[in-house]
Design a protein with these regions (language model features):
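The feature captures the beta-strand-to-loop junction immediately N-terminal to the Walker
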Residues: 33-35
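Helix-to-loop junction immediately C-terminal to a conserved catalytic motif
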Residues: 48
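Conserved ABC ATPase signature
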Residues: 131-135, 139
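Conserved ABC transporter NBD signature motif
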Residues: 53-63
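Conserved ABC ATPase "signature" region
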Residues: 109-127
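ABC ATPase nucleotide-binding domains
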Residues: 231-232, 236-263
Length: 263
């Protein structure tokens, strides 16, 4: 389980996140939503152990702050919003970075085929020999997802769940590949891992998230199921838009129809 209690994060003298609680069980996709500047990325980086924080965060019963980088890398992989590569790496070389996990020397034999399998999962078969910088933004995003999948390919390790932390994983993708990536996340969770993802598309969030955490001005505005959190009044207040939340009879999942900005 990922558990956070009273988490606060400051950058310099500015408080970015204040008093946020969160619990995510293995088998779940948890979505963090909120307007730009609400503290989502900062909170995700604290959860994954990439930023210092106040309060408590634990992963699989261990305090994140006490974990060595190699320990954390064995059980969680992080997809950032953007990954700038300055060197002329091929796609295969970028994906293989996910296999390092703090290791040095030769990679274990059982990992040799993982880069190609990961590229196939994100529908980039045959791209391994191409240069990363030559790809479109959406293709680069899928390469980075293949990299993090290599890092935690098996959703369970030594009887413990592994975790994907995804910061806007579908922001550069067309609708087909958005669904492809979210299906990969759902499959990872169903096989015993867990996913924490920052998403902006509220309808995609409703389709895939088991639990939603709504952030507003650095604090948690709401937490719960899609039906509990995607409400007209809450979403209008947090995002400052006029909208209508409906529920089709077929699956009962809420859908969000924006109408206009709040004047």
């Amino acid at each position: 389980m990922i558990e956070a209690s009273g988490v606060a994060v400051s950058i310099g003298r500015k408080r970015i996140v204040s008093g946020v609680d969160l619990k995510v069980q293995p088998g779940e996709i948890a979505a963090i939503v909120g307007p730009n500047g609400s503290g989502k990325t900062t909170f995700l980086r604290a959860l994954s152990g990439d930023l210092p924080y106040e309060g408590s965060i634990s992963m699989n019963g261990r305090a994140v702050a006490s974990m060595r980088p190699s320990e954390a890398a064995a059980f969680r992989a992080v997809l950032p919003q953007a990954a700038i590569m300055s060197f002329p790496f091929t796609v295969r070389e970028v994906v293989k970075l996910g296999l390092l996990n703090g290791r040095s020397g030769a990679l274990p034999e059982e990992t040799q085929g993982l880069p190609e399998r990961a590229l196939a999962r994100v529908e980039l078969e045959g791209f391994g020999g191409r240069f990363y910088q030559e790809l479109s933004g959406g293709e680069q995003q899928r390469v980075q997802l293949a990299r993090v999948l290599c890092q935690v390919w098996a959703p369970v390790l030594d009887g413990k769940p592994r975790w994907l932390f995804l910061d806007e994983p579908v922001s550069s993708l067309d609708i087909r590949h958005q669904l492809t990536i979210m299906n990969i996340a759902r499959d990872f969770a169903r096989r015993g891992g867990g996913v924490v993802a920052i998403l902006h598309d509220l309808n995609l969030t409703a389709m895939y998230a088991d639990r939603i955490f709504v952030m507003h001005r650095g604090k948690l505005a709401a937490a719960g199921s899609p039906g509990e959190t995607l409400r007209d009044d809450l979403i209008a207040r947090v995002f400052e838009v006029r909208l209508k939340v409906g529920q089709p009879p077929r699956d009962g999942l809420p859908f969000v129809l924006p109408q206009s900005a709040v004047e």
